[in-house]
């Protein structure tokens, strides 16, 4: 998740030692990166949730000038604490319509079972639709990639849809 407001960043966990993410430092770091590599492509990911759906990130996006802006509707994993409804998600998207040429938005249905994720233990994992956490494969190095891949739900059509 990303926010420009300190209190929102604290609520959504964008913090270090109880101090909110430094927005100005982030902008300076992006400037440094671009001075080193002027052709680098910057992608911003935003997870829209109950604390940031009404925020405007327009000034931030205008300053960063990313190549791509991925906007995700928060996926409830363990509970609904940060959940929003479709109307709130669309509200955020409508408020940022001027960036539609770089926005790629994904709702919960589009995200579920469409990512290949590997945890620090070397296991594939996927979200479980009933908000009970994750489903894990056995470790890839123990059973092989093919067997581990068969142990999790994955929808290739959804995966490919993001790259068309």
What is each residue range found by the language model?
Residues 2-6:
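A glycine-centered beta->alpha junction motif in the catalytic cores
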Residues 7-125, 129-163:
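Radical SAM enzyme [4Fe-4S]-AdoMet core and its adjacent flexible, acidic
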């Amino acid at each position: 998740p990303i926010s420009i407001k300190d209190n929102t960043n604290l609520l959504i966990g964008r913090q270090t030692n109880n101090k909110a993410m430094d927005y100005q430092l982030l902008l300076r770091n992006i400037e440094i990166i671009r001075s080193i590599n002027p052709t680098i492509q910057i992608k911003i990911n935003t997870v829209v949730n109950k604390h940031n759906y009404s925020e405007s990130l327009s000034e931030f996006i205008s300053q960063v000038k990313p190549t791509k802006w991925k906007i995700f509707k928060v996926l409830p994993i363990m509970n609904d604490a940060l959940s929003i409804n479709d109307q709130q998600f669309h509200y955020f998207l409508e408020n940022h319509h001027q960036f539609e040429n770089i926005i790629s938005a994904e709702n919960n249905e589009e995200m579920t079972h469409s990512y290949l994720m590997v945890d620090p233990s070397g296991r594939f994992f996927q979200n479980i639709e009933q908000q009970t956490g994750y489903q894990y494969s056995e470790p890839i190095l123990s059973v092989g990639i093919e067997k581990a891949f068969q142990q999790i739900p994955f929808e290739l059509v959804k995966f490919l849809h993001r790259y068309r």
